[in-house]
Amino acid sequence: MKLFFDHITGKLTNYDLIYSLALAEFEDNEYEYAFENGWIPLSWYYTKLKNLTWINARNTRLVLDKVEFSKKQKYVLRKKDIKVKILNSFDYDLLSTIYKKYIKYRNFYEEGFENDSEVFEKKDYIDWKYFIYYYKDTPVAFTEFKVFDNKHVLSGQFAWDYENPKLGLGTYATLYEKQ
């Protein structure tokens, strides 16, 4: 493991303020340690460093062998009109269309920069796979994920077009991806 810091800003003259990201590079055989200690990979620095960069960030770790579904959760997973496909690569137009609708519906944009906020940027060096969720044979949502080994899966962006909010696809996707 190699640790390094990106000192973004700070003011030490009158204040003791330092804003710095703690980053790391791990060897493949150190990934388990990284995940178990709150590190997650990101690709922001990849072009500069040429390696997968990890950040120590708040995240959720589940031991899937211990996840048990309630009757209500099992019922949610029996929705007959929802189908899921796994893709090894992404269709930019498909994901972009879903993402744009998601950003608009949820108001996840910065005022004055709406058009920029709605762009699904994929200058990403993590080789994501995709759960594509279909409602009545129409793609309506996706989740990106990366499998590291038989114990560690990283979940990335989720987006849903919200054309039918009563579908509860956020809940459905969360449950589906845990099974």
Q: Residue locations for each model-derived region?
A:
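Generic detection of long, well-ordered alpha-helical segments
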Residues: 21-28, 88-96, 171
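Conserved acetyl-CoA-binding loop-helix of GNAT-fold acetyltransferases
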Residues: 166-178
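Short secondary-structure boundary micro-motifs
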Residues: 7-8, 16-17, 114-117, 174
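Amphipathic alpha-helical segments that form well-ordered structural scaffolds
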Residues: 33, 98-101, 176
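A conserved beta-strand-loop-helix scaffold within acyl/acetyltransferase catalytic domains
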Residues: 39-45, 49, 68-70, 75-166
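Acyl-donor-binding surface of acyltransferase catalytic domains
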Residues: 2-83
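Generic intrinsically disordered, low-complexity segments enriched for polar/acidic and small residues
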Residues: 1-2, 16, 96, 117
